[in-house]
Amino acid sequence: MRDDVNQSFYDVLEFVRIFRRKNKLQREIVDNEKKIRDNQKRVLLLGDLSDYIKSETSIEGIQVIIANMRNDYEDRVDEYIIKNAELSKERRELSKKLKNFKESTID
């Protein structure tokens, strides 16, 4: 009987741990989506800026800087997309564990 109580207690602790991790992942995903949107807006801004700048010698240097900044922002967007996919995958796995955990404790 005591082992059953201990096991149930540890099962509840594990359930809480998984549930908290799942919620944390969801918050990180939302945060990354915001970062993706922000950086996509920066990419558009820099694209518009490049369209308006005239191609004089001194401005060419500015265009090179803008192009480099744009590439940096695009790289960040890609990194956040990859990170978001990884977080989503882990969240799905935790959801499955929680579902299986609930089903096994009900039986």
From Swiss-Prot:
Residues 70-104 form a coiled coil. One of its GO terms (cellular component) is cytosol. It comes from the Bacteria. InterPro entries: DUF496, UPF0265. It is found in: Cytoplasm. The keyword GTP-binding does not apply. Keywords: Coiled coil, Cytoplasm. Its main location: cytoplasm. It holds the Pfam family DUF496. Pole-localizer protein involved in the regulation of several cellular processes. Belongs to the pole-localizer TmaR family. This is Pole-localizer protein TmaR. It comes from Blochmanniella pennsylvanica (strain BPEN).
